[in-house]
């Protein structure tokens, strides 16, 4: 089954691809590698999910924010590649959580994005290697930022 069909069957709506927040490329293709710059939890209304996890958001709200980051990444891929079916697999995900120092469930939060990608590309191709880490702050006080390296067909 195709990634595009899987997305449709999930009934999820992609937000618009986020605008750039600085001097960088949202997507860079090098051979069969597709690098996607860090994305935040961008919503349909153009706003972002903000706040510090463990203070302003609980772990489940943060996990939902990470899923929203995944949707924003999918929107950027579609805008730049034309179709999610051009992606073969997820290679590496780096998830950054804006959290209080005592928060320890960063991997649980980033599962929001990883589980989405597994549903889009299947377990074999949608799950790659990953790091999930905590930060004292993120740009614009966003709750989660994620960057991903994909392999193209």
Where are these regions (language model features)?
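Short, polar/acidic, helix-capping and beta-turn segments at strand->helix junctions
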Residues: 1-153
């Amino acid at each position: 089954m195709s990634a595009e069909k899987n997305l449709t069957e999930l009934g999820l709506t992609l937000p618009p691809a986020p605008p750039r927040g600085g001097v960088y490329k949202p997507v860079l293709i090098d051979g069969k590698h597709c690098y996607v710059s860090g994305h935040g939890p961008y919503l349909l209304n153009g706003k972002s999910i903000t706040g510090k996890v463990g203070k302003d958001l609980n772990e489940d709200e943060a996990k939902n924010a990470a899923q929203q980051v995944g949707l924003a990444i999918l929107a950027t891929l579609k805008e730049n590649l034309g179709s999610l079916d051009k992606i073969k697999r997820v290679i590496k995900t780096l998830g950054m959580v804006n959290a209080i120092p005592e928060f320890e469930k960063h991997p649980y939060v980033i599962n929001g994005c990883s589980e989405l990608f597994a549903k889009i590309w299947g377990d074999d191709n949608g799950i790659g290697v990953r790091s999930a880490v905590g930060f004292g702050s993120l740009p614009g006080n966003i709750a989660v930022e994620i960057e991903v390296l994909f392999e193209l067909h």
